[in-house]
């Protein structure tokens, strides 16, 4: 009977025979399949890991059997905050805890039975990987795509450290609860904005979920509009606002500038300064994400000054509001509350004027296009023409011009943290900023560093690390103390997998350009606007440097859903609703666990765990095992054989070919739940056939072998065992995936239901080539139906070909 012993038996056999080793010399039908690598946390693999990895492995196994040369590597995204925070809390060094966790997770991943190419493993915290992280930084620096400037960061005055946006919860440090402030620090950036237009355009060329592409488009935020120049009343000060709806310019009733805008000090009246300063301090405690939340109430404070609308000379009040970001556009917006929901909410709260200038809609705010009204000589123009006409007018008077704007900002990559890749830069008093020569890489991360937070980069405390010599002049110099954002590690790891043992280069161009890009990439949708965008940028940058000959890293992308606890809530130790894969595997075996995950949930949606579901799957696997045993006995018995293809044989052959077709199509589209449902139907057909008095053993043998083949990707250990039970040659994964026969899917007979007034009264088998009239006659004359029609008036007979006949009668 199937159990974890079966799993271990075949895992050992696969290891001994190196069955899944990728042959890079076979260039035909290559298939690079990749799941997002995981962070090596201290806990075991959870249900989410399994839901990501196991179904994708099933897809890849099917593709292997279909003749593809599958490359499916695995590794660990091993730098990052969790290990550093854990070290601060426990005193265990990040390197020690991380390597221990990697060892544990490697064993757990191998127990899954996935056909990962472990010989191609990468671990980002090891020098043989982050050496090339540093090389990548140097290439970007060499091509003016890496630069340094001052930038505001989240600062916890209690922990004396910089916090990432995700570490700020409702304006407070998630670790200690202290209110977070903003602080300016000198930071390193990658110039992703040089590629914004191409990143937008090439989304049309990749097979990604539309929602994910829409998220990236929104994040990059391309806007075509107009820069409008406002003058501050009673002064010489001018400022620009960017708008995509310049046709509403006559409806501006106030303007809002960001709290960080340089204008604030110069436009704030004396009597408003105290309130303004309080507001600015409060704004420092909010992250950009929080400030732009659509559910958060908009707030603001008046400066006491007025701006002059350039189109009509009208004075409008100048406010500051934290929902306006200084990093987007000009850090100032014109407010048209009649035609913008955010402006309407703000104006209503602070009792500011609301004036309609676009016709349409029964209520305000009206945000759609329409005819301009209350707009002087522009009245009657429809929005597109109005935009063009007003922009031209502003250009003529020198107070505006057309412009394309983007929300995307350059990627801030420096972190004041220890557990990350050291930035390969040296600072020399004589020579300035000097890149570390490539021959001196890696700049190794020192082990003995005091990294308790005190507001400075931990590496500053290591004199041995910091003190070096300038590679240009040879004088004493200092190293950069910041480390790289861990998203840099994952921005190119898919390239290193294919050439992970190369000690001379990050990767061999010829080798990479044959195997890449990744054909199928799978991971969570939460990475849409960071990792997935950064990887696209790095690919394009390396292409332009001459290292790659392709434009996109991941041709196809799929997202897995979330497995929830039995209570329908997100799994959490504190809620007591977690599911341990290890416990499930020990009880049922990894294939039962794998198949339940694929059958019990839509892969893209996920859902709530159900203990009854995995129990049912265990029973299903046991049932298959019994059927295989019965069929083996039948084949070996030599009794009650026949060679003819009668009705029962045709029905079995139909089920066989229909299942092959359906499973191939459904699993190919990541619809694993319906693929396994088809396998269950196929199982029922097999069981039904072996109850026949006489059997076509040749057909039965071919059918059971095809059955084991199509279940193999979903239950690999179990399928290998049944393949061996049937006396077949190792391994089933060297077998060719079965192909369906279209002729077998053409039925000579079909079962239809006969209804009277919509209620089923009988079922009959009829030839598939009958006309509607012949079907009507057969139905009405059926022995079970005739008595029910006596004394009734048949009004009409409805035929639904291949499904049913409905006889409509009246007394």
From Swiss-Prot:
Q: Tell me one Pfam family matched here.
A: Anticodon_1
The cross-references to SUPFAM superfamilies, in alphabetical order and at most eight, read: Anticodon-binding domain of a subclass of class I aminoacyl-tRNA synthetases, Nucleotidylyl transferase, ValRS/IleRS/LeuRS editing domain
The residues that cross the membrane are none
> Which reaction equation describes what this protein catalyses?
tRNA(Leu) + L-leucine + ATP = L-leucyl-tRNA(Leu) + AMP + diphosphate
Q: Name one GO molecular function term.
A: leucine-tRNA ligase activity
Please provide one cellular component term from the Gene Ontology annotations of this protein: cytosol
Q: Which top class of enzyme applies to this chain?
A: ligase
Q: Where is this motif: 'KMSKS' region?
A: 570-574
Subcellular localization, as worded in the UniProt entry: Cytoplasm
Keywords on this record? Answer: Aminoacyl-tRNA synthetase, ATP-binding, Cytoplasm, Ligase, Nucleotide-binding, Protein biosynthesis
Positions that bind ATP: 573
Kindly state the positions of the motif 'HIGH' region in this protein.
38-49
Task: List its EC numbers.
Answer: 6.1.1.4
| GO BP terms in the entry | leucyl-tRNA aminoacylation
**Primary location recorded for the protein, binned into one broad class:** cytoplasm
Entry similarity comment: Belongs to the class-I aminoacyl-tRNA synthetase family.
**Name this polypeptide is given:** Leucine--tRNA ligase
């Amino acid at each position: 009977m199937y159990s974890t012993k079966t799993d271990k038996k075949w895992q050992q056999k696969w290891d001994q025979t190196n069955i899944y080793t990728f042959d890079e010399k076979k260039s035909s039908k290559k298939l690079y399949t990749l799941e997002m690598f995981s962070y090596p946390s201290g806990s075991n693999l959870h249900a989410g890991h399994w839901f990501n990895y196991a179904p994708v492995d099933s897809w890849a196994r099917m593709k292997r059997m279909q003749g593809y040369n599958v490359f499916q590597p695995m590794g660990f995204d091993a730098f990052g905050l969790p290990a550093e925070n854990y070290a601060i809390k426990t005193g265990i060094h990040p390197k020690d805890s991380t390597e221990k966790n990697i060892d544990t997770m490697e064993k757990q991943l191998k127990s899954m039975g996935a056909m990962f190419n472990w010989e191609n493993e990468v671990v980002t915290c090891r020098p043989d990987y982050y050496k090339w992280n540093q090389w990548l930084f140097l290439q970007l620096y060499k091509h003016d795509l890496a630069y340094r400037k001052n930038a505001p960061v989240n600062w916890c005055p209690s922990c004396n450290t910089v916090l990432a946006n995700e570490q700020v919860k409702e304006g407070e440090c998630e670790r200690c609860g202290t209110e977070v402030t903003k602080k300016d620090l000198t930071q390193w950036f990658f110039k992703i904005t040089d590629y914004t237009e191409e990143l937008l355009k090439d989304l049309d060329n990749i097979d990604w979920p539309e929602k994910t592409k829409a998220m990236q488009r929104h994040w990059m935020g391309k806007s075509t509009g107009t820069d409008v120049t406002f003058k501050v009343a009673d002064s010489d000060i001018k400022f620009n606002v960017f708008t995509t709806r310049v046709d509403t310019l006559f409806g501006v009733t106030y303007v809002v500038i960001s709290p960080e805008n340089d204008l604030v000090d110069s436009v704030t009246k004396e009597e408003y300064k105290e309130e303004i300063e309080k507001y600015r301090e409060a704004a420092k405690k909010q992250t950009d994400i929080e400030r732009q939340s659509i559910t958060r109430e908009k707030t603001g404070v008046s400066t006491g000054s007025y701006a002059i609308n350039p189109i009509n000379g009208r004075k409008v009040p100048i406010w500051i509001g934290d929902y306006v970001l200084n990093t987007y556009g000009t850090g100032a917006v014109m407010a048209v509350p009649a035609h913008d929901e955010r402006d309407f909410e703000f104006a209503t709260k602070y009792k500011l004027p609301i004036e309609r200038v676009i016709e349409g809609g029964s209520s305000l705010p009206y945000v759609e296009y329409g005819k301009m009204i209350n707009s002087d000589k522009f009245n009657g123009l429809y929005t597109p023409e109005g935009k063009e006409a007003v922009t031209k007018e502003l250009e003529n008077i020198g107070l505006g011009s057309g412009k394309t704007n983007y929300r995307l900002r350059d990627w801030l990559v420096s972190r004041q943290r220890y557990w990350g890749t050291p930035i390969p830069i040296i600072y020399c008093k004589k020579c300035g900023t000097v890149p570390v020569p490539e021959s001196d890489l890696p700049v190794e991360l020192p082990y003995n560093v005091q990294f308790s937070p005190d507001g400075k980069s931990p590496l500053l405390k290591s004199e041995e690390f910091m003190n070096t010599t300038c590679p240009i002049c040879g004088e004493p110099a200092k190293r950069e103390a910041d480390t790289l954002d861990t998203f840099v590690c994952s921005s190119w790891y898919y390239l290193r997998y294919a050439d992970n043992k190369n000690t001379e280069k990050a990767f061999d161009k010829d080798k990479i350009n044959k195997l890449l890009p990744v054909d199928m990439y799978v991971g969570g949708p939460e990475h849409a606007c960071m990792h997935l965008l950064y990887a696209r940028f790095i690919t394009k940058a390396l292409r332009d440097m001459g290292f790659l000959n392709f434009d996109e890293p991941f041709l196809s992308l799929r997202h897995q859903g979330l497995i929830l606890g039995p209570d329908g809530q997100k799994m959490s130790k504190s809620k007591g609703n977690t599911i341990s894969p290890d416990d499930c595997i020990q009880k049922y075996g990894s294939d039962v666990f794998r198949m339940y995950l694929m059958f019990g949930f839509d892969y893209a949606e996920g859902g709530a765990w159900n203990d009854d579901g995995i129990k049912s799957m265990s029973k299903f696997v046991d049932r298959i095992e019994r059927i295989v045993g019965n069929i083996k006995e039948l084949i070996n018995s030599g009794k009650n054989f026949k060679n003819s293809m009668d009705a029962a044989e045709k029905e079995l052959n139909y089920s066989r070919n229909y299942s092959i077709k359906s499973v191939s199509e459904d699993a190919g589209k990541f619809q694993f739940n319906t693929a396994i449902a088809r396998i269950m139907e196929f199982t029922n057909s097999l069981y039904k056939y072996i109850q026949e008095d006489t059997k076509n053993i040749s057909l039965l043998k071919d059918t059971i072998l095809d059955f084991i083949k199509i279940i193999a990707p979903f239950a690999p250990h179990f399928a290998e065992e049944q393949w061996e039970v049937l006396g077949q040659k190792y391994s089933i994964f060297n077998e060719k995936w079965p192909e369906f026969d279209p002729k077998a899917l053409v039925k000579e007979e079909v079962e239809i239901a006969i209804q009277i007034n919509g209620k089923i009264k009988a079922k009959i088998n009829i030839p598939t080539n009958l006309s509607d009239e012949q079907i009507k006659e057969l139905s009405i004359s059926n022995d079970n139906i005739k008595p029910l029609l006596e004394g009734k008036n048949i009004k009409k007979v409805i035929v639904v070909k291949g499904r049913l006949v409905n006889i409509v009668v009246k007394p």
